[in-house]
Design a protein with these regions (language model features):
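Intrinsically disordered and other compositionally biased segments
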Residues: 11, 18, 61-62, 68, ...
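Extended amphipathic alpha-helical scaffold segments
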Residues: 57-60, 64-67, 109-116, 165
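Sec-dependent bacterial lipoprotein signal peptides
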Residues: 1-21
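Short, solvent-exposed, charged loop/turn and helix-capping segments
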Residues: 70-126, 130
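Generic alpha-helix initiation/capping and coil-helix boundary signal
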Residues: 3-5, 9, 39, 43-46, ...
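C-terminal amphipathic alpha-helix
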Residues: 32-52, 57, 118-177
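Immediate post-signal-peptide N-terminus of mature secreted/exported proteins
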Residues: 20-92
Length: 177
């Protein structure tokens, strides 16, 4: 009988501790930590977008170097010169957007890291913390949407730069020889 009473009291104490637990559950902490790792993909995407913009810029610089003195002929051709200026401006704009979005993503990820680091000290319940975490996820989702849109613009611009390079090479590359 004594064993039954001790077991019952022990079980009641454990139940009371769990029921009165303050702070997030271990499952919530694990869920948030796993989701945070998923959010880090956005940082990689932002870096890739910035690198793609830089590679487009380099493509135009390489074209200019490849043509050498014949580049002057491109500059004198009103249509090609205007197209080059437009492409250069678009690349600079998208490069700026990539850097801005990258900064936004880094700021959100820093906030997510601070949230995760502070979870163990929190006294709030899962439901309250889930609202805060949801706001962080929403910011990352917004940035991911911007990154997707930027990726589409960069892909389109990549095609335009390729077409421009083909046109210029077709017109002026033979004259270099």
């Amino acid at each position: 009988m004594r064993y039954v009473v001790q077991t019952f009291i022990g079980a009641a104490l454990i139940w009371a501790l769990v029921a009165c637990q303050s702070g997030p559950s271990q499952q919530f902490i694990q869920k948030v930590t796993a989701e945070q790792n998923d959010l880090k993909v956005s940082a990689d995407q932002a870096k890739a977008a910035a690198e793609k913009a830089a590679s487009l810029k380099k493509s135009l610089e390489d074209l200019k170097a490849e043509l050498g003195k014949n580049w002057e002929k491109v500059e004198k051709d009103k249509d090609l010169s205007a197209q080059y200026q437009t492409l250069t401006q678009q690349i600079m704009d998208l490069e700026g957007q990539a850097n801005t979005i990258s900064s936004e993503v880094q700021a959100v990820l820093s906030g997510a890291q601070a949230f995760v680091d502070g979870l163990a000290q929190q006294k709030k319940k899962d439901e309250e913390l889930d609202k805060e975490w949801g706001a962080i996820r929403e910011k990352v989702s917004d940035a991911a949407g911007k990154l997707s849109e930027l990726g589409e613009k960069l892909s389109t611009l990549e095609g335009e730069v390729g077409n421009f390079a083909e046109t210029v090479k077709g017109k002026f590359a033979q004259a270099k020889k």
